[in-house]
């Protein structure tokens, strides 16, 4: 965390958070996550990629709790973080553990494979399959999965697969990587 680009970006984020009336960048990001949740709760659609898919839920489940390492906000992580996480606030995931070590390239145990322990697969093994949906009964997932192919190749990256045990029961799954637990 000593690279000049990192220090510059950190200063920019802190300046913007203060300008918008927040005491810290984590507070600002949690407020934005709540705005996004409200948008979705009111019928809006959300398409998220990469770390956005799980970082929303981490932010929402830790509203009012210091879950950010001191390197990010200058204050210590709440010592009772694990017991204070409120999964009822999250959109799609539950019962996950948050990874707070800033030296580990991972946020939680939601995604599979974990970003800090990537399983490198060749081009033929790097794919996921979309499920079929009825346009009559399921118009939204039908629209979102219309790619004219049933298998999407070469799409794996940070947070593109999820541990099924961490997905809330009401979440509609539109595709799968059969190697995911």
Spans of features found by a protein language model:
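Short alpha-beta junction capping motif
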Residues: 1-55
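Short, surface-exposed, charge-dense and proline/glycine-enriched linear segments
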Residues: 2-14, 77-85, 100-107
